[in-house]
Amino acid sequence: MNVKIIVEFIKKFAEENNCKKIAEIGIGFKFDVARELSKYFDLIAIDINEKAIEKAKLLGLNAYKDDLFNPNISLYKNIDLIYSIRPPRDLQPYILDLSKKVNANLIIRPLLNEMPIKELKLKNYKGEVFYIKEKQI
């Protein structure tokens, strides 16, 4: 997984789609992508793990605890782009549903060799694989 290329792809996609506010879903303890993207965008980091949120805040990220199975929709007000790095396959439909509820673009950087869930388009970028869904206009 090449963090530099992942950041480059998300940044390029966000700029091309005029995304101002973005959210990383399921940040866990991997903060590299969010920290870099927060230099360019209003970014929030989301996870269900309280310790991950505390660590993200210590690193200067705007981080919030939330549950994908029962999301607090108000956290995602004005979010233009949701992205997630290597989320478990069984969580991906919930991430897609959330992006639809808030009408946000979606980028998922999957684990390798996963089949995309319906409605997501496969995109290869400099050796990295992404699934994307553009928001409805």
Curated annotation (Swiss-Prot):
Q: Which Gene3D superfamilies match?
A: Vaccinia Virus protein VP39 (3.40.50.150)
InterPro entries tied to this protein: SAM-dependent_MTases_sf, UPF0146
Instruction: Name any one Pfam family assigned in the record.
Output: UPF0146
Q: Which family does it belong to?
A: Belongs to the UPF0146 family.
Could you tell me what this protein is called? Answer: UPF0146 protein MJ0688
Q: Which organism is it from?
A: Methanocaldococcus jannaschii (strain ATCC 43067 / DSM 2661 / JAL-1 / JCM 10045 / NBRC 100440)
